[in-house]
Amino acid sequence: SILCDADLVIVAVPIRLTSMVIRQLKQLPQSCILADVTSVKESPLYEMLKVHPGPVVGLHPMFGPDVTGLVKQTIITCDGRAPDKYHWLLEQFRVWGAKIYPVTAPEHDQAMAMVQVMRHFSTIAYGYHLMTEGADISQLVEMSSPIYRLELIMVGRLFAQDPILYTDIIFANPDNIAMMKRFAYRFLELLEDVEIGDKDAFVTMFNQVADWFGDYAEVFLQESKAMLLKANELKKH
């Protein structure tokens, strides 16, 4: 009843609860915009389209709660229904400084499997490996160059957050399993080159990846230099 006059309803709950919550939204006004902000899109969009006959859009803000404004922040959008009805919402995000990046739900979930799932899974595996190897974290910090310190920061910050959040992201899509298996296969493939001492194969692979990155490799190198300078200024230990 509290939503009977709503113009916009945004579902912002943990991934594992999203579908259940959406299924309760059966009495929204026809003109109400129904949206979600979860990090997977195909399943929520399907549920929203099924429960609500009005305008539907999937949103994925590519930033966390520490961000204080929308300037230069990316919001991915996935059309569900009636984009002309929710156009004003996206325009308002633009007014606040956000960059709107529209894709289909399948494109979104495929990209997130690489951008989020693989990155989180690799980071968790690396942290788990450091722990099981009995690494001295204080010593690693003291002996790290700026770039490796930054990598340790990225690992450590993940383990300072809610494990359920990352578990939900990794476990949300069964297709992620195949992606992680392919990653493990390529890891072992490169390990085999190291084991047999095939440096030529390793260098060939390296150059192939460098060619694939193209101009982005140099762009990322320069961006990382600026980030490292900033990180060094903020260093507390």
Residue spans for each PLM region:
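An accessory alpha-helical subdomain
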Residues: 104-237
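Rossmann-fold dinucleotide-binding core
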Residues: 40-103, 109
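Short charge-dense sequence patches
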Residues: 1-2, 35-46, 61-64, 102-105, ...
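Alpha-helix boundary/capping residues
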Residues: 9, 25, 96, 115-118
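A general structural signal for well-ordered alpha-helical segments in protein cores
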Residues: 6, 18, 86, 180, ...
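Short, basic, helix/turn surface patches
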Residues: 20-23, 84-92, 127-137
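Rossmann-fold NAD(P) dinucleotide-binding segment
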Residues: 1-48
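Short secondary-structure transition/capping segments
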Residues: 6-8, 69-70, 112-116
